């Protein structure tokens, strides 16, 4: 799995953890091991510009996903996963820090960025949260992936509660 993390934000973030949790999420979703993903970490000004340009919404947001080949997880266990370019995930540590502090289970900026990386991966794979049933599916899957990764890493304490709506 080729995953690049490029921090352009000027904020120190745990790039290795973002890489690790993205890799874990893609493996858990059975994405082809030769697929490619890019994660870019930007400051609030850059994120605001992307948010306005692509969503026509003011202000910075926490995470944006830009799919390329529209890869989807295999439907059956014996299906061969497709290979390709997943796309780009853009994260904003300034928004992540605020959300981590405001979350029901307060957590660090890095923990929020890990959660957002999984959220971005799921969006690249076609998951959404516009409708209540879609939201339940996506957020349930997101929690299972984050919990599984945290358990594998031996991390204790409550998992970050979703702050993405």
Swiss-Prot record:
Signal peptide: none
One GO MF term attached to the UniProt entry: RNA endonuclease activity
Keyword Transferase in annotation: no
Residues annotated for Zn(2+) binding in this entry: 119, 123, 129
Family matches, as Pfam families: YbeY
Record's subcellular location: Cytoplasm
GO BP annotations, alphabetical order: rRNA processing
Cofactor binding note from Swiss-Prot or TrEMBL: Binds 1 zinc ion.
Principal location: cytoplasm
Superkingdom of origin: Bacteria
GO CC term (a single one): cytoplasm
Cofactor or coenzyme needed: Zn(2+)
Sorted UniProt keywords: Cytoplasm, Endonuclease, Hydrolase, Metal-binding, Nuclease, Ribosome biogenesis, rRNA processing, Zinc
Family as reported in the entry's similarity comment: Belongs to the endoribonuclease YbeY family.
Function: Single strand-specific metallo-endoribonuclease involved in late-stage 70S ribosome quality control and in maturation of the 3' terminus of the 16S rRNA.
HAMAP family named among the record's database cross-references: Endoribonucl_YbeY
Record protein name field: Endoribonuclease YbeY
Organism: Streptomyces avermitilis (strain ATCC 31267 / DSM 46492 / JCM 5070 / NBRC 14893 / NCIMB 12804 / NRRL 8165 / MA-4680)
